[in-house]
């Protein structure tokens, strides 16, 4: 049987030749291997009056016979010696009852059992006699059957008779060649006629045993939607059918071939079968295994299929920036027909596939583990034509509707039964559907995943001393090139740190400016980064951990996080000791049994040990003694640290002399304005007692003492303390030293002077890319950026009036309401300044699209009085879609209050805040105009 149909399909070409070579090779091999098995199938002949039928009901040997004038089923039964019960058993699907069969009129078809046919070879003409041309078109051949299969010939001819028959054919041809009465082409025609008749017989025998061939051709769109399928029996008996099925299809711009085999086992009233398929998508290089089962009865079919991928992830054939592979899944199918009205059929199917991004409906609608149920009806008015409609409803409310029409031409049957309604019933029976195609999804359902076209990785966290600048190591892989990296460093900025671009040409060259170390605080900050490529694709968010220390160290390994002395001074007698304690942690967790090495960085002293191991609390201790007066600095380091951590300096003093035992500053940063002073304090002791009225000499390498000079003396008070102040009018770093007569210099911790923090009065209007004064007419959600300088270079922002204006971490201000707002900025060195936003003369607020009347109501009759009002806003702020809130909009056409002339004409005027484009005489019910209010 060959069918032709059309379906709704779309879309590419290529690899067609490869596909058909594969099919041709498969079919050729199949025909070669199975050429003898075809000879034992069904045979179709026209019956002559002297043909004899043997009454053996064999499913493979059936005769489709059309009653002639004067013939009835009863007369055929008597003349051929076939019982009516046998004939009825073969015709139940054609007639509603035996009595109806007996009423069959001339021209109607019945099925008769066929085993052997009498063939009269004696009808051949004697050699040399005049030729007789039969209806078949072969001269001298009076065979009363127009078609004869090889098995019938073999069954009715002994070897001798077959040889005799062949000899007679040859003799007949020789006689005709000798006859002078024949014209020159007659011999050739005769030979070709004999050969053609035999070839037609062979071809018909092949065609009627092919089972089913289904062809669907779509003439448009490069034949997208076309398919070709064959079911080919290679072993066929009454109770079992073994078959192969091959197919190819070009659907959605993909060439897919299917190769399968299976068996069907026929019981008296039902059929059980199984099949195995390999599906190959040549376009996308996808391979899938299919395993299915079948259960059929008269008027009912069911099947279940499982689909299992045999190929893995690879670049998608037709979906950019995605990989694809076959999705695993299954489907269950049911088809039923009404016995009383077999032309009408119904279909029910459920399919389920598994994966995160499966294209069950199409590659633009990816779903997770999608399923779909299909219901359909079909109508077959005559065997030649079937029309159907299917509705499929799936996960996520996806659905589609498919209309189809098939034309089925069966080579094994005459034309008449294919266009008469009463023969539809046969298609619905087991015998009539014996060679039907396997019901399965021959298209490979695919699963997709987004390619890693852009990835961002930060392999190392950052650990550094306060106020240091640390380079961030970024690893970026981008298919289309890196455009930018967006950071969320709000936690870092809140303490005066920030992430900033280094200013190089590379888009991935960033550095971290660390804030001040907070004594007793966690000093650990989390920042995130996301990369964007030149096509707008974004990477995953990546987190960076920044740990700030009071001195240089690295702690993403096992490292010393804190190193302190139990006192600031001791006797330089070689006996009194200062005890240091080092705390070792990894990622904030104390570490036991870690060796810590100690070293004297500066000064003269002796360590109690060069190393120690941490206890259960992560603590390691060491003592320091000295017989030499002076200042000493000690460091601690683990094996995994790249630099040691220094403790604060300690002082060894000579007890019998007045000595400085302590020096400190009240802060480590100051404003370089000549006024912000750092106060230094020293303590002078002798024999364990404070020394009163003793002179202390101070020196500095930067700034001025008391605003006068870089050297200054101060006198101790009754508590033995002397103080002095240091200021600077320029930015820089200062180291102050102090000494007493006969003693050593003692250095204080380094102090940094920063320029004063200030905000420029000029702002950057972001949508217009200009710098100037803040306009006194506002566009709601307009944005500008404040420019700040001074401080330590790290800033945090805060708005005191967020209902009026908000500010982000970069100093970008967004206007939200009409009024006055104060924006504060604080630098990492704790300087704070403010910027006051003054209320505007008026503000423009954009509402929704509305008719003129509704717009007036929405705005409380406060529409713009003229186009000039909005033109001024445009001139001050630029196009509205230059700001985040309006970024996606292409037009904001706004109503203008009607003039008197407008009221008479029943129209109004508009102005567009994005394109300008002023209009007059606009209908008051225009659908795409916004209510824009003036506040």
Swiss-Prot record:
PROSITE patterns: BIG1, LYSM
Main localization category: membrane
Domain Big-1 stretches: 560-653, 660-754
Region spans: Signature sequence for beta-barrel assembly machinery (BAM), which recognizes the unfolded beta-barrel in the periplasm: 402-411
Keyword tags: Cell adhesion, Cell outer membrane, Disulfide bond, Membrane, Repeat, Signal, Virulence
UniProt-annotated stretches for the region Required for periplasmic localization: 40-212
Region (Peptidoglycan-binding): 40-153
UniProt note: domains: Has a signal sequence, a periplasmic Lys M domain, an inverse autotransporter domain (residues 210-411) predicted to form an outer membrane-embedded 12-stranded beta-barrel, followed by a linker domain also embedded in the outer membrane, and an extracellular passenger domain (residues 450-935) with a tightly-folded proteinase K (PK)-resistant, non-Big domain (residues 450-550), Big domains and a C-type lectin domain. Linker domain is important for the stability of the beta-barrel and spans the barrel pore in an extended conformation creating a large cavity on one side of the barrel pore.
Name of protein: Intimin
